[in-house]
Structure formats: structure tokens, C-alpha cells
């Protein structure tokens, strides 16, 4: 015997929420793949300075997002199917998966908040080391290539000190030239551009995480209410 009345409304409401959750998983998976293959981040994070690769903390986070998106799509499908079939077993499994996902999201959110500036800091240190080598050593071709890639990708020049900026503009054409010396001298520094690049992407990820967390809370409540409704309906 199927559920009736308010419980039936909850059943279809849970189905709708799960469909939205499934779509959200697809969006997160798509955004993560876009961030993974975004030309700006790819150009910078594939660089190597001698034996030292560029910091890969950002990509670790992206791979986690890809996994989360795929799991969300699976869990969303499980919830849709469990709601339509009115299966207590599937709904219980769905609820357990949601609790685990929610706990992981909270833990990841805390870690991300604590380390939100670390990614940009690591990339800036990598850039500063390459810039220093390129300025000091005329034969540091690898360092020059790294610096020029930063400058051309971000359309910036030098770090956040005027002395380094002026030196790097005048030294070995490391900065992209606009044909105007004054414009080159006052081109935005790369530290600001690096902060802008990563803070924008982290902001996007944060909004997505909050939306998903709200949906998950509603789904956990609805799945338990529906599960209880199914159990009660089978008694009568």
C-alpha cells in the first residue's frame, strides 16, 4: 500500500529536492572540470622552476570537488529512486550517505576557511623565487620562462614593491610591453593578480558549497519523515 495525504506530498517534494541535488552535483562536477582545465590556472600551475614544481594545493582541492560532484550525482539518483519506490532501505542508505557527505563538506569548509590564503601565498612565493633568479642571473632561462608565463597569463609585472617592479621592467624584457615605458612601470603587480585569480575561484566554490549544504539539510529531514510515513502506512 502506497503512502497517502501529506506523506505523498513529501514523497514528491523529496523527489524534486533529489533531482535538484543531482543537478547540483552535475554543476559542481562541471565547474570542477572547468577549473581544472582553465587556461590561466593551468598555465601557472604546470610550471617548474628547476626541480621545484608549482604548488599543487589548488589542484588537490579540484580533484576533491570532482569526486564530490560524482558522488552527489549518485546519491541524488539513489534518493530519487528510493522516494519513487517508497523503499525504507534505499531511503535509509540515502540518509546515511547524506550524513557522511554533510560531515565531509563541513570538515572541508573548515579546512578551506583556515587555509583560504595559503594557495595564493604558495604561488606568490613560487613567483617571487623565479623573479629573483631571473633578475640576478642572466643565464637563468628556466626562471625567465616561468616569470614571463606569469606576466603574460595575468597581464602583470613584478611583485608588490616598486623597486622590484622597476628592475623587472627594465631587465631582460621580462614584462609584457605595451610600447609605453610609463604604462609598463605602473602595470599592476603580480601579487595582486594572483590574489584576484584564486580568491575569485574560491568565492565561487564557497557559494556552491553553501547552496548544497542547505539542500542536504532539507533532504535529510524529508527522507526521515518519508521513511517514518512509509513505516506507518504499512501498519494499517
Swiss-Prot record:
Its main location: membrane. Residues 34-63, 113-201 are extracellular. Not glycosylated. The chain crosses the membrane at residues 13-33, 64-84, 90-112, 202-224. GO terms for molecular function: cholesterol binding; integrin binding. InterPro entries: Tetraspanin/Peripherin, Tetraspanin_animals, Tetraspanin_CS, Tetraspanin_EC2_sf. Cholesterol binds at residue 219. Residues 1-12, 85-89, 225-236 are cytoplasmic. Disulfide bonds join 156-190, 157-175. PROSITE patterns: TM4_1. The record marks 116, 144, 148 as: Important for interaction with integrin. It is a multi-pass membrane protein. GO terms for cellular component: basolateral plasma membrane; immunological synapse; membrane; plasma membrane; tetraspanin-enriched microdomain. It is found in: Cell membrane; Basolateral cell membrane. GO terms for biological process: CD4-positive, alpha-beta T cell costimulation; cellular response to low-density lipoprotein particle stimulus; humoral immune response mediated by circulating immunoglobulin; immunological synapse formation; macrophage fusion; myoblast fusion involved in skeletal muscle regeneration; osteoclast fusion; positive regulation of B cell activation. Keywords: Adaptive immunity, Cell membrane, Disulfide bond, Immunity, Lipid-binding, Membrane, Transmembrane, Transmembrane helix. The keyword Disulfide bond applies. Binds cholesterol in a cavity lined by the transmembrane spans. Homodimer. Part of a complex composed of CD19, CR2/CD21, CD81 and IFITM1/CD225 in the membrane of mature B cells. Interacts (via the second extracellular domain) with CD19; this interaction is initiated early during biosynthesis in the ER and enables trafficking of only properly folded CD19. Part of a complex that includes MHC class II/HLA-DR molecules and IFITM1. Interacts with IFITM1. Interacts with IFITM2 and IFITM3. Part of integrin-tetraspanin complex composed of CD9, CD81, beta-1 and beta-2 integrins in the membrane of monocyte/macrophages. Belongs to the tetraspanin (TM4SF) family. Structural component of specialized membrane microdomains known as tetraspanin-enriched microdomains (TERMs), which act as platforms for receptor clustering and signaling. Essential for trafficking and compartmentalization of CD19 receptor on the surface of activated B cells. Upon initial encounter with microbial pathogens, enables the assembly of CD19-CR2/CD21 and B cell receptor (BCR) complexes at signaling TERMs, lowering the threshold dose of antigen required to trigger B cell clonal expansion and antibody production. This is CD81 antigen. It comes from Bos taurus (Bovine). The gene is CD81.
